[in-house]
Curated annotation (Swiss-Prot):
List of residues binding ATP: K240
Protein role: Catalyzes the attachment of glutamate to tRNA(Glu) in a two-step reaction: glutamate is first activated by ATP to form Glu-AMP and then transferred to the acceptor end of tRNA(Glu).
PANTHER family (UniProt xref): GLUTAMATE--TRNA LIGASE (PTHR43311), GLUTAMATE--TRNA LIGASE, MITOCHONDRIAL-RELATED (PTHR43311:SF2)
Record-linked NCBIfam families: gltX_bact
Motif ('HIGH' region) on chain: 9-19
Family to which the UniProt record says this protein belongs: Belongs to the class-I aminoacyl-tRNA synthetase family. Glutamate--tRNA ligase type 1 subfamily.
Protein name, per record: Glutamate--tRNA ligase
InterPro entries membership: aa-tRNA-synth_I_cd-bd, aa-tRNA-synth_I_codon-bd_sub2, aa-tRNA-synth_I_CS, aa_tRNA-synth_I_cd-bd_sf, Glu-tRNA-ligase_bac/mito, Glu/Gln-tRNA-synth, Glu/Gln-tRNA-synth_Ib_cat-dom, GluQ/Sye
Pfam family, one: Anticodon_2
SUPFAM superfamilies per the UniProt record, alphabetical: An anticodon-binding domain of class I aminoacyl-tRNA synthetases, Nucleotidylyl transferase
Keyword entries, A-Z: Aminoacyl-tRNA synthetase, ATP-binding, Cytoplasm, Ligase, Nucleotide-binding, Protein biosynthesis
Annotated localization: Cytoplasm
Length: 467
């Protein structure tokens, strides 16, 4: 049987980090087994579902490279199908109409709570065989078995069993003809021929109800795998503040999609002590039943380390487009400065994110705005002008503006003046960047460009003379 998995987000918000991990695990399991990965948009919550959220989910999936093998399925386009299946269950005596008012249902709930019981529907309409009537309270309820147990072998959690006596007759169709979650997902997974249902363990309590529906419909039962939740770094439930952000906010913060994928897969799964995987290695090695049943903890330091690894090792040509995007987000005209690939080579060892790289790269694309006064006091003081003037003369006369030529000019300055290279590099570094810290001084000057470098040296000389 062909493996078919699905990711089924509700478009009531963005794709968060937990949803992205679920999508990744579904995608990997399907790819490893040469199966199909499908996307279903569970958009029946008409008050909260939005097209903007749908677009955001699709955009995030595309950014992560989680491609799906068939067009997305939208639940709102399948309302007729849900009604057909509900009608079949009615005709077979496996479901029934109920017309209980909200007050009646609230009274049932309060009575159960007073006696310390679990709130549940009391089945008042189960045997009444009530006919259809136009009523705002009309629902269709599924006749859950009263006896026996529901058991299944979860690929992650192991054997799970529950008595049917703990389950009530759930609503499957609302008065407006829209399905409830538990009903819709069973019909969808059946129609989509899903063989493995991989989802968060917040759905584990729904599974026995769904299994009974599968049996009532005579539908083949998929295999279930319920993923443990992701906790924040303190071991608490994730919030927007502690990491449960829109996946695209990770992009905006400067993380690479393949770095995030590499990090996410390790939040619950491992292959020995190996930390870094390319995509094909993940496809070859990942197995859903190897996922740990315990909750994973977010570790932003580890994500930064993984991201920096790829910044250091990826081809600069592949890193250039996302770096340009980050520079443009800062209002920078990239055509006014050095090639992005050169910037990447200069900064890749010094940063963990593309956002940080773009911030540091501003010195090569924008006029120098300010000086670090501590750096000025230490390095742009009387006497420093000698090295700056000598370096300026050689830089202005270079036949070609290359890193090697710039480096030669600076070293020649140190040799000619019989001073250490630091006496040349540090005043020049402050003159060019306004700070005491930068990449290799020759590369820093080269990326600034001849005209801008000379202009900044002149400004530093004026600053020294007026100190």
């Amino acid at each position: 049987m062909t493996c078919r998995t699905r990711f089924a987000p509700s478009p009531t918000g963005y794709l968060h980090i937990g949803g992205a991990r679920t999508a990744l695990y579904c995608w990997l399991e399907a790819r490893r087994r040469n199966g199909q990965f499908l996307l279903r948009i569970e958009d029946t919550d008409r008050e909260r579902s939005t097209q903007a959220a749908i677009d955001a989910i699709l955009h995030a999936m595309d950014w992560l490279g989680l491609d799906y093998d068939e067009p997305p399925v939208y639940q709102t386009q399948r309302i007729e199908r849900y009604n057909q299946v509900a009608a079949r269950l009615l005709a077979e005596g496996k479901a029934y109409y109920a017309y209980d008012s909200k007050d009646t249902l609230n009274a049932m709930r309060e009575a159960a709570l007073r006696t310390g019981e679990k709130p549940r529907y009391n089945g008042a309409a189960r045997e009444a065989n009530l006919p259809y009537r136009d009523d705002p309270n009309r629902v269709i309820r599924f006749k859950n078995p009263h006896t026996g147990t529901v058991a299944f072998d979860d690929l992650i959690k192991g054997r799970i069993q529950i008595s049917n006596s703990e389950l009530d007759d759930m609503v499957i169709l609302r008065p407006d003809g829209y399905p409830t979650y538990n009903f819709a997902v069973v019909v969808d997974d059946w129609d989509m021929n899903i063989t493995e249902v991989i989802r968060g363990d917040d759905h584990i309590n729904n599974t026995p109800r769904q299994i009974n529906l599968y049996h009532a419909l005579g539908a083949p039962l998929p295999t279930f795998a319920h993923l443990p939740m992701i906790l924040d770094e303190q071991g608490a439930k994730l919030s927007k503040r502690t990491g449960a952000a829109d996946v695209m906010q990770y992009r905006d913060s400067g993380y690479l999609p393949h770095a995030l994928i590499n990090y996410l897969v390790r939040l619950g799964w491992s292959h020995g002590d190996q930390e870094l995987f390319n995509r094909q290695a993940l496809i070859d090695l990942f197995q859903i039943n190897d996922v740990n049943s315990k909750a994973a903890r977010l570790d932003m330091a580890k994500l930064g380390w993984v991201n920096q690894h790829y910044l250091k090792t990826d081809d600069p040509a592949t890193l250039a487009p996302p770096l340009v995007w980050h520079l443009e987000q800062r209002g920078i005209d990239v055509s006014a400065g050095p090639a992005p690939t050169d910037v990447i080579l200069a900064l890749r060892e010094r940063v963990q994110t593309l956002k940080e790289m773009a911030e540091k790269a501003e010195i090569w694309y924008c006029p120098l705005q300010r000086y670090d006064e501590i750096a000025v006091a230490k390095h742009l003081k009387p006497g420093a002008e000698t090295a700056l003037l000598h370096a300026r003369t050689l830089l202005a006369a270079l036949p070609a503006w290359t890193v090697d030529n710039v480096d030669t000019a600076l070293r020649t300055t140190a040799t000619t003046l019989e001073i250490g290279m630091g006496k040349v590099a540090q005043p020049l570094r402050v003159a060019i960047t306004g700070t005491q810290v930068s990449p290799d001084i020759a590369y820093t000057v080269y990326l600034t460009g001849r005209n801008e470098a000379l202009k900044r040296i002149d400004a530093a000389l004026i600053k020294i003379s007026t100190a």
